Regions:
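Secretory targeting and sorting signals
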Residues: 1-24
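Residue-level hotspots at or immediately adjacent to binding/recognition sites across diverse folds
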Residues: 19-405
C-alpha cells in the first residue's frame, strides 16, 4: 500500500492530460483489431498494485475515486485462480482531488476492514454515498459524506447486497438489493416499494427526483403455451406514485425455442423524453434444432410511449452502454463507442511504459470499471486496472486514464 500511495504526487496531471496527451499510444498487444482514428485512452496515473472500481466527478475541483488492494496477509491474496476458494480480504482506499492535487483520504470506519465492489454515487452540493460489500459480498454497507464528515446510512431492513442505486439527495435514495428488494430512503427510514404483480426490476435511472425509471421484466407464463416466459417491463415514478408503462413485446417465430424470454438489463435516462432500455430476447439454447438467433432488446421512451428502435451497427451491435459521454455518444463494453449519429468505433488502449517490473514483451489487458465526464470541460476520466502477463509472472496495477479525442 505504501508504494501505491507514493505515486499520487504525479496524479495531478489527470485533468490536464486529456487535452495534451503524448501521442505515444501503441495499443494493447494481442487485440487483433485495427487501431481506430480519433479517440484513445491515455494513462494519467499508474499505481503499483490493486484496482480502482469507481470514480465520481462533481467538478474539476472535486473528484473522488475508490479502489482496493489485496491484503498481503490474507492466504488467498496472490493465489492463482482455483487455488483458494472464496473471496479474499481487501483493503479499501479512497482518493480525492481538490483541483490542485490528489490526496489519500481515510475510508469511512463504517465500511470495516475489508472492502469489495465499492461504488460512488453523487448527491449534489459536494455530498456523496460510498457503498461497498463485505468480504463474502452478501451484504453492503453505505456511508454518507456531507462535505465535512462521514456518517453511516442505516442498514437495509432485510440486509443484502446493493446491486443498483439512484440518489437525488441525502433524503431521497432508491436502491435495489438482494434480500431487501426495492427500497427508498427518505432521510428517516427505509420503505419497501410495491411493484405490480409479476414485475421484477433490475435497473434504475432518472433525470430528476420526480422522474425516475425502474426496468426489468414481467412474468407472462411458464413457456408451455409456446409464448415467452418474460416480457420487458418498466415502471415510472412521478414524485407521487409508481405507474407501470406499456412496453412492446418480443416473439420468436414458430417453431418457438425452449423457454423464451425478453427482459431489460439496463435503463439509461438521457432526458425526460429520451429514456433508453437495453436487454436481450433469448431462450434455453441446445434444446432444439434450427434454433433462431437471440436478439437485442432496444426500446426508447419519447415522453409518451415506448417504441422498438434499431440496435447499433457493426461491432457496437449487441453491446450495452456503460456510461454517457454528454451529448456526444455512449461508452460501450470492451472500449467500443457509438456516437450520437450512430457511428461505431473502438477507443484505442495504451500500453504501460516498460520498466518498473513491466517487460516490453508483456501482454496487457486494460479493464475500465467506470468512466465519468468532467462537467463543462469535454474531458472524460476512467478508472480500473491493467493486468500484466509476462512469462507466468502476473501483476495488476490500478490506473486512472483520460480520453484523448
Amino acid at each position: 500500500m505504501r508504494k501505491m500511495v507514493a505515486g499520487l504526487a504525479v496524479l495531478g496531471s489527470v485533468l490536464t492530460a486529456c487535452a495534451t496527451g503524448d501521442g505515444g499510444d501503441r495499443g494493447d498487444r494481442g487485440d487483433g483489431g485495427a487501431k481506430p482514428a480519433g479517440m484513445s485512452w491515455a494513462y494519467d496515473e499508474i499505481l503499483d498494485e490493486g484496482s480502482l472500481s469507481d470514480v465520481l466527478v462533481n467538478g474539476a475541483d472535486d473528484v473522488w475515486a475508490v479502489g482496493t488492494v489485496p491484503d498481503s496477509t490474507d492466504p488467498s491474496a496472490g493465489a492463482s485462480p482455483g487455488e483458494v476458494s472464496g473471496a479474499s480480504s481487501s483493503d479499501g482506499f479512497l482518493l480525492h482531488r481538490d483541483g490542485t492535487r490528489w490526496q489519500r483520504q481515510p475510508m469511512p470506519a463504517v465500511l470495516g476492514d475489508s472492502v469489495h465492489q465499492a461504488r460512488l454515487d453523487g448527491l449534489g452540493s459536494g455530498g456523496l454515498l460510498l457503498t461497498a460489500a463485505v468480504q463474502d459480498t452478501t451484504t453492503s454497507r453505505t456511508a454518507h459524506w456531507d462535505g465535512k464528515e462521514w456518517a453511516a446510512l442505516p442498514k437495509l431492513p432485510d440486509g443484502g447486497r446493493v446491486t443498483e442505486m439512484k440518489a437525488f439527495a441525502a433524503d431521497d435514495i432508491w436502491v435495489l438489493a438482494t434480500l431487501s428488494g426495492f427500497r427508498h430512503w427518505d432521510g428517516t427510514r427505509w420503505s419497501a416499494v410495491a411493484l405490480p404483480d409479476g414485475v421484477t426490476v433490475t435497473t434504475l435511472d432518472g433525470v430528476a427526483s420526480d422522474d425516475l425509471w425502474a426496468a426489468g421484466f414481467r412474468s407472462t407464463g411458464d413457456g408451455t403455451d409456446g409464448h415467452e416466459m418474460q416480457q420487458p417491463a418498466a415502471v415510472h415514478w412521478d414524485g407521487k406514485a409508481w405507474r407501470q408503462t406499456d412496453m412492446p413485446e418480443y416473439r420468436f417465430p414458430d417453431p418457438v425455442p425452449a423457454e423464451p424470454s425478453a427482459s431489460i438489463a439496463r435503463v439509461l435516462a438521457v432526458a425526460a423524453d429520451d429514456i433508453r432500455a437495453y436487454g436481450t430476447h433469448s431462450f434455453n439454447h441446445g434444446e432444439g434444432v434450427d434454433e433462431p438467433e437471440q436478439e437485442a432488446v432496444r426500446l426508447r421512451w419519447d415522453g409518451s410511449r415506448w417504441s422498438k428502435v434499431a440496435d447499433a451497427e457493426g461491432d457496437c451491435a449487441g453491446r450495452v452502454p456503460e456510461a454517457r459521454d454528454g451529448d456526444r455518444g455512449l461508452f460501450l463494453d470492451d472500449d467500443r463507442y457509438v456516437t450520437a449519429d450512430g457511428a461505431c468505433t473502438k477507443i484505442a488502449r495504451p500500453r504501460l511504459p516498460d520498466g518498473d517490473g513491466v517487460r516490453a514483451d508483456s501482454r496487457q489487458v486494460l479493464r475500465l470499471s467506470a468512466r465519468e465526464p468532467v462537467p463543462g470541460t469535454g474531458q472524460v476520466l476512467g478508472v480500473g486496472s491493467v493486468q500484466v502477463n509476462q512469462g507466468g509472472d502476473q501483476t495488476t496495477k490500478a490506473v486512472v486514464v483520460s480520453l484523448k479525442r
